[in-house]
Amino acid sequence: MNRRYFLFPKVSGEYLITCYQQIDGNQYAALYTETLTIKLQNEFLPFLYPNQYVDFSSKSEACKLAASLVKEDMTDIDILKTFYTYVTSHISYDYDKADFVEAGYLPDVDDTLSTGTGICFDYAALTTAMLRSQDIPCKLQIGYSGDVKHAWIDVYIRG
């Protein structure tokens, strides 16, 4: 079985789920509606697993790299600094990609490693995958820096 994770829900709360069937063209009819009340046992759980933005598995090169960089006596802060230093010194910013990236783009963390290039979304996804693979909760954020679309991470450090 191929397990896929999607970031849903992010937080505890009430969620309305509706399944639609295409009737014709862009017309849809609701087939099923359900309201779910979600109570997360651990608020950081959604930030430890892969999802559509940060897609990885234990076999990913990003996870193998993360494991090779971590030493037994390292704290979460040490690991974060090590991963940050690695990513920022081994990945070059791809200005052409930034100029022509299309809506719906999703990063491939192993492709970013193999090409050694990426945009902010790639940097953030790669670092997030590496941190999550070491059980350090990390949230990838997408928003704007001024009027420029940007991606960055929030890291939750224990202690």
Residue ranges of predicted features:
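A short, structured loop/turn motif at beta-sheet edges
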Residues: P9-V11, D73-M74, R158
